[in-house]
Amino acid sequence: MAAQFGNYVDYSGAKAPGSATHVRDPRLQILAATIPQIFANKHILDIGCNAGSVSIQLSLDFHAASVTGVDIDPKLIAQAEKLLALRASRATPPTSCSAPVVDYFPMSAVLTHGYRIEPHNKPARTPSAASAAWPYVTFFSADWVLPSDQDATDSYHVILALSVIKWIHLEHRDVGLTTFFAKCSSSLKPGGYLVIELQTWDSYQKAIRPNHAPHFQETLKELQLRPETSFDSLLANHGLHLCASSDALPRRINVYQKA
């Protein structure tokens, strides 16, 4: 089935065998091992959050101070809200003396007694202030590339763009990708990190197949920027410099730091 924006349900990159929403994402584990404390007590933006698994893990498993997840598809944000309610309902909240214990209550407890923390019924369409209540995760639906009255500078310690750059590039072309990188830079605090999961040019070509996103065929012909050769210099122009990378997974993960 073709996808309008590349936002396949439950798609946020190649999945590890046997992976599930409560199993720590290997990309996050690699990042935490490469740059210790990259997530703990940090304010994080997850762009293209899909159904919310990564955003929620950042809070529950990697102890972020707050996480904001944004996706262009409100249906995926609704799924993310339900997953957040489920995972938060299975955990013990943090106390002044201890961190939360995730997956403490069995699924049967939720099935029998319902959510301890109810999901939001209507996905937000604008970013609100970071949630003041545990688990400190906020979701909203928007095309983050586009300017908004809610945009703020120096807001985040970390911005994640996992398995989403290709779709931003195809949707908004070279000029939109440049705008996206500039907005990432302005949204990061000094010393903050932009994390990109690179999608190679051949994956762009595969994306326009009839059963994927054929409506991007003409757009692809217009693109001059290439992920393998153009991104580092383009990001450097916006004050974001490559500081770490990993080829441990099928897709390279690059980390850029704001000067």
Question: What do these predicted ranges mean?
Answer:
Residues T21-K42, Q57:
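Conserved alpha-helix/loop element of class I SAM-dependent methyltransferases that forms part
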Residues K42-N50:
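Conserved class I S-adenosyl-L-methionine
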Residues A80-E81:
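Conserved SAM-binding loop
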Residues T178-P190:
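A short glycine-rich, Lys/Arg-flanked "PGG" loop and its adjoining helix->strand segment in the class I
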